[in-house]
Amino acid sequence: MRKSLLAILAVSSLVFSSASFAADLEDNMETLNDNLKVIEKADNAAQVKDALTKMRAAALDAQKATPPKLEDKSPDSPEMKDFRHGFDILVGQIDDALKLANEGKVKEAQAAAEQLKTTRNAYHQKYR
């Protein structure tokens, strides 16, 4: 009986701890916004790379979420496909900026990161 109880507690703690690792959409959006500000103020490639890496992870995680405006839509709906496509675009732009940062081109990476704002604004207008 005691071993069963311990096993149940162990499994339930794993389930609850793994659920806390997945950030919600709002947290991911905040991560994207905060790190975009870091990129704008950065003065070295390491800062830019770190911020872009965090942004990439947040964008990929956010892509799996459903925005409140689309909660009544099926995952295969055109709107949800477009929502996810927006993150594909964003991740591509992040990758382009990351490539520049890896080459030590800080100013160019910052300029490339400016495109993220255009994508953000377009998709916020649709789904926020």
UniProtKB/Swiss-Prot annotation:
GO cellular component, one term: periplasmic space
Cofactor(s) needed for function: heme b
Residues that, per the record, bind heme b: M29, H124
Cell compartment(s), UniProt: Periplasm
Record text on cofactor binding: Binds 1 heme b (iron(II)-protoporphyrin IX) group per molecule.
GO biological process: electron transport chain
Gene3D superfamilies: Cytochrome c/b562
TM regions (residue ranges): none
Location of region: Disordered: 60-82
Entries under InterPro entries matching the protein: Cyt_b562, Cyt_c/b562
One MF term in the entry's GO annotations: electron transfer activity
Key words, A-Z: Electron transport, Heme, Iron, Metal-binding, Periplasm, Signal, Transport
Stretches with biased composition (Basic and acidic residues): 69-82
Segment forming the signal sequence: 1-22
Function: Electron-transport protein of unknown function.
Assembly notes: Monomer.
Recorded family membership: Belongs to the cytochrome b562 family.
Protein name (record): Soluble cytochrome b562
